[in-house]
UniProtKB/Swiss-Prot annotation:
It comes from Methanothrix thermoacetophila (strain DSM 6194 / JCM 14653 / NBRC 101360 / PT). One of its GO terms (molecular function) is structural constituent of ribosome. Belongs to the eukaryotic ribosomal protein eL21 family. It comes from the Archaea. One of its GO terms (cellular component) is ribosome. The keyword Ribonucleoprotein applies. Keywords: Ribonucleoprotein, Ribosomal protein. The gene is rpl21e. This is Large ribosomal subunit protein eL21. PROSITE patterns: RIBOSOMAL_L21E.
Amino acid sequence: MPKSHGFRKNTRDKLKKSVRERGISPVVRAIQDFAVGEKVHIIIDPSIHKGMPHPKFHGRTGTVVGRRGRAYVLEVPDQSAKKLVIALPEHLVAQK
């Protein structure tokens, strides 16, 4: 069989919810608000496909640079480069 080149390839464990997290995500997570300059963690919610950043960025921390519609534009360091990642608030968690 040919190798898959899809967006979610090699994510069997990365995009898996634990038993206690299964089911519908809370609405509070969708209406979070982040200020520009705030640090956020990218934690992908696999049950919500819209606005999902690339799985490569799962677990990374970035800085909010701006908004694009309902989504946030984040600046995430990737080795020596800085990448812009667009993600909906459902996939973001504020850094404490």
